[in-house]
């Protein structure tokens, strides 16, 4: 089961909140923030790592790099993560998360055996311009970081409730990491999943029931179309350029 190879890092309040959901499903997790007020909202969370000397970053993502760089204990813990696949989750529009996730990914990518999967929770169109600029800059920095695998872009406009979006994200990734179903026809094994996570580019998941509303079997075309349908992920280009599809 791929889950045994997974560690989760949550950066900033948004990233911590999602990572805490994985913690409840018994994934090894690291929750990093510099705001005592933010941390107090995660009642019962374990392994909360505090950016000492920084009680909030006032929306300035450039401060997050300095905050993380000056907290050697946190950097050491990150560099010592044993799991092969590390999922790093942060808000693209925030300060702590968007400012620190490129450095975290860069540190982890120093180990060529690691598979680094950034998850960026992207701001809505009606949010302040600074948040959208933060999201653009962090996405650009992540794309330019050597050794990074697939990137997951979450569309915070997909549902009115952020809690619903977070819940769906946790459910879908957990299903991907834990599914060990098999058949005589074909198997989607852990090595193939790992390859998908290791390849650079946008990563999306679509989940369909066994039967559609007309009680007809779901076709391969249905499955492929669902990848570009409305879901919690940012829309991908419908240009036919795909590296891997796992069904």
Which residues does each PLM region occupy?
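Tubulin/FtsZ superfamily GTPase core signature
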Residues: 1-247
């Amino acid at each position: 089961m791929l889950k045994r190879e997974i560690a989760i890092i949550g950066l900033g309040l948004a990233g911590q909140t999602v990572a805490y959901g994985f913690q409840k499903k018994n994934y090894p997790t690291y929750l990093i923030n510099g705001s005592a007020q933010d941390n107090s909202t995660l009642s019962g969370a374990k392994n909360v790592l505090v950016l000492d000397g920084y009680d909030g970053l006032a929306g300035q993502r450039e401060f997050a790099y300095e905050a993380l760089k000056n907290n050697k204990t946190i950097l050491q813990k990150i560099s010592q993560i044993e799991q092969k696949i590390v999922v790093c989750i942060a808000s693209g529009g925030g300060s702590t998360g968007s400012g620190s996730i490129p450095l975290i990914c860069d540190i982890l990518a120093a180990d060529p055996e690691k598979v680094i999967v950034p998850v960026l929770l992207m701001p809505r169109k009606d949010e302040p311009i600074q948040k959208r600029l933060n999201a653009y800059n962090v996405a650009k920095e992540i794309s330019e970081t050597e050794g990074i695998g697939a990137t997951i872009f979450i569309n915070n406009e997909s549902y009115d409730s952020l809690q619903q979006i977070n819940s769906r994200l946790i459910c879908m990734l957990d299903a991907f990491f834990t599914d060990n179903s098999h058949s005589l026809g074909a198997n989607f094994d852990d090595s193939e999943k790992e390859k998908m996570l290791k390849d650079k580019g946008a990563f999306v998941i679509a989940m369909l029931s066994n039967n559609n509303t007309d009680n007809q079997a779901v076709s391969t075309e249905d499955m492929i179309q669902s990848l570009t349908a409305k879901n919690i992920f940012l829309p991908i280009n419908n240009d036919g350029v795909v590296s891997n599809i796992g069904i």
